[in-house]
Curated annotation (Swiss-Prot):
Modification(s) after translation: Autoubiquitinated by the CRL2(KLHDC2) E3 ligase complex.
Record key words, sorted: Kelch repeat, Nucleus, Repeat, Ubl conjugation, Ubl conjugation pathway
Pathway connected to this protein: Protein modification; protein ubiquitination
Source lineage: Eukaryota, Metazoa, Chordata, Craniata, Vertebrata
Function according to Swiss-Prot or TrEMBL: Substrate-recognition component of a Cul2-RING (CRL2) E3 ubiquitin-protein ligase complex of the DesCEND (destruction via C-end degrons) pathway, which recognizes a C-degron located at the extreme C terminus of target proteins, leading to their ubiquitination and degradation. The C-degron recognized by the DesCEND pathway is usually a motif of less than ten residues and can be present in full-length proteins, truncated proteins or proteolytically cleaved forms.
Protein name: Kelch domain-containing protein 2
Transmembrane segments: none
């Protein structure tokens, strides 16, 4: 469960309400780290991860695999949905994306080791219960691994790096064994710099022939897609947690290393990197080489090639192996993760808290809705004059008691 050996919205109508599914509305999901979270811009879907066993103390356990938690980014409400079908095993360190409201899940680490299985779940389904489907893809798959990254471009999912088993088939790229894994596992593992493409129309795996200087093998790094560039920052390789920044041109498959001007974030793994505009990435948290959890946030300006430290109110809330998703309202929603040294298992402080970072100016609609809510007593008699979809938004917000980050 560690970072090596520790290791535009489619329209202006309301999105799917998920009210028709068999569900259970609770306050929030359990605390966790190593989970996945993806977004359709209005909802954040959370699956998997693990937490400490509160009864036995020294043991970690994976969260229930059937549970899919959906966070409404507008109202701040959580909903739990119990999924069915080819449900993936409970895992940590998996890699997930959401494309056109379809969730794709690859890799991870479960109770029997690493996996390279691929799953999908269509959140647009009209069935009463959301169904997982395991896809038997064509071509040579990536090796079994966790803590890898992914870029989404056109009809392709492009996976990079990770920590796991030696590939069984010949692949392009470098694999470096972790010597310490020979002592504590019958299946030694290591880091890699492999690039694998999955075509989501044919479900076929392939590898591109890349040019330029590739990044070193790594795991627990962070990836983000902007245009035709797949960015990767940091991650762990052997005993170092790095702060290098690279991008892969997803048309030409050429690697480029970026040397930003001025100050840069310290090296880290288990951090998040989120695209927030066509020119900016948002970096938060992580874990340093000297095993310190981080609470700093940065924005990277692509056109200026520079990092800028981002001021925020959560400096006393470090997070590592958390998740971060961008909303349609210019916010980054951070969920879960660990607040201290994750490697001291019996003391790991896993979180289930939401941290909200406003990284873009709020829209006029959002500002107007907040004003209506602020002066609700004064304006209540005029609510029926609002368009139906805005009235729906106001009513939903009144039903929420989650004001974190506002």
């Amino acid at each position: 469960m560690a970072d090596g050996n520790e290791d535009l919205r489619a329209d202006d109508l309301p999105g799917p309400a998920f009210e028709s599914y068999e569900s259970m509305e609770l306050a929030c999901p359990a605390e966790r780290s190593g989970h996945v979270a993806v977004s359709d811009g209005r909802h954040m879907f959370v699956w998997g991860g693990y937490k400490s066993n509160q009864v036995r103390g020294l043991y970690d356990f994976y969260l229930p695999r059937e549970e899919l938690w959906i966070y409404n980014m507008e109202t701040g409400r959580w909903k739990k949905i119990n999924t069915e079908g080819d449900v993936p095993p409970s895992m940590s360190g998996s890699c997930a994306v959401c494309v056109d409201r379809v969730l794709y899940l690859f890799g991870g680490h479960h109770s029997r080791g690493n996996t390279n299985k691929f799953y999908m779940l269509d959140s647009r389904s009209t069935d009463r219960v959301l169904q997982w489907e395991r896809i038997d893809c064509q071509g040579i798959p990536p090796s079994s691994k966790d803590k890898l990254g992914v870029w989404v471009y056109k009809n392709k999912l492009i996976f990079f790096g990770g920590y796991g088993y030696l590939p069984e088939d010949k692949v392009l790229g470098t694999f470096e064994f972790d010597e310490t894994s020979f002592w504590n596992s019958s299946h030694p593992r290591g880091w890699n710099d492999h690039v694998h493409i999955l075509d989501t129309e044919t479900f076929t795996w392939s590898q591109p022939i890349t040019t330029g200087k590739a990044p070193s093998p790594r795991a627990a790094h962070a990836c983000a897609t902007v245009g035709n560039r797949g960015f990767v920052f940091g991650g762990r390789y052997r005993d170092a947690r790095m702060n290098d920044l690279h991008y892969l041109n997803l048309d030409t498959w050429e690697w480029n290393e970026l040397i930003p001007q001025g100050i840069c974030p310290v090296g880290r793994s288990w951090h998040s990197l989120t695209p927030v505009s066509s020119d900016h990435l948002f970096l938060f948290g992580g874990f340093t080489t000297d095993k310190q959890p981080l609470s700093d946030a940065w924005t990277y300006c692509i056109s200026k090639n520079e990092w800028i430290q981002f001021n925020h109110p959560y400096t006393e809330k470090p997070r590592l192996w958390h998740t971060a998703c961008a909303s349609d309202e210019g916010e980054v929603i951070v969920f879960g993760g660990c607040a201290n040294n994750l490697l001291v298992h019996h003391r790991a402080a896993h979180s289930n808290e939401i941290l909200i970072f406003s990284v873009q100016p709020k829209s006029l609609v959002r500002l107007s809705l907040e004003a209506v809510i602020c002066f609700k007593e004064m304006l209540a008699n005029s609510w029926n004059c609002l368009p139906k979809h805005l009235l729906h938004s106001v009513n939903q917000r009144f039903g929420s008691n989650n004001t974190s980050g506002s």
